Amino acid sequence: MKLQLIAVGTKMPDWIQAGFTDYLRRFPKDMPFDLIEIPAGKRGKNADIKRILEKEGEQMLAAVSKGSRIVTLDIPGSRWETPQLAQQLEHWKRDGRDVSLLIGGPEGLAPACKAAAEQSWSLSPLTLPHPLVRVLVAESLYRAWSITTNHPYHRE
């Protein structure tokens, strides 16, 4: 199983890049984790936000690996505690398909992305900065993996 994080936005702050890359390097070779960045549409005073969202959504869905399970990161999604996320990760591994996790831009995810998703995951009821979500997802999935393999990273 391969994990893909497909996120709107490029040119992240150094601390985001460093945090995300740190967790990315920790993943085992049998569970590669790739980041695909989708350029954010230009937002200005007279921008057509609906059209920008549609275009970002089209690009995100085009980046999804064929046959991949799509999981959106969205406030109304399922809230998993760490042991539940570990169970989800095990379920995804048994399923055998790749998993594509989608993080939207400033206005969230396009309706097409939400419609294509098999699951939606909520990290928090809070609105989080989208760059920070990258680091939180990577850490959470690494922690879940550590539970499934009895790695000492996670402690109860």
From Swiss-Prot:
Q: Does the keyword Methyltransferase apply?
A: yes
Catalyzed reactions per annotation: pseudouridine(1915) in 23S rRNA + S-adenosyl-L-methionine = N(3)-methylpseudouridine(1915) in 23S rRNA + S-adenosyl-L-homocysteine + H(+)
Q: Which domain of life is it from?
A: Bacteria
- The protein's predominant localisation is cytoplasm
According to its UniProt record, the EC number is 2.1.1.177
Keyword rRNA processing assigned to the entry: answer is yes
Q: Which Pfam families match?
A: SPOUT_MTase
Q: Which InterPro entries match?
A: Alpha/beta_knot_MTases, RlmH-like, tRNA_m1G_MTases_N
List GO terms (cellular component aspect). Answer: cytoplasm
Provide the binding site for S-adenosyl-L-methionine: L73, G104, L123, S124, P125, L126, T127, L128
UniProt cross-references to CDD domains, sorted A to Z? RlmH-like (cd18081)
- Keywords of this entry: Cytoplasm, Methyltransferase, rRNA processing, S-adenosyl-L-methionine, Transferase
Task: List the Gene Ontology MF annotations in alphabetical order.
Answer: rRNA (pseudouridine-N3-)-methyltransferase activity
Localization recorded for this chain is: Cytoplasm
Say what the protein does.
Answer: Specifically methylates the pseudouridine at position 1915 (m3Psi1915) in 23S rRNA.
Family, according to the entry, reads as follows: Belongs to the RNA methyltransferase RlmH family.
What does the subunit section of this Swiss-Prot or TrEMBL entry state? Homodimer.
Query: Which HAMAP family does the protein's record reference?
Result: 23SrRNA_methyltr_H
Annotated protein name in UniProt: Ribosomal RNA large subunit methyltransferase H
State the organism named in the record: Photorhabdus laumondii subsp. laumondii (strain DSM 15139 / CIP 105565 / TT01) (Photorhabdus luminescens subsp. laumondii)
**What gene name does this entry carry?**
rlmH
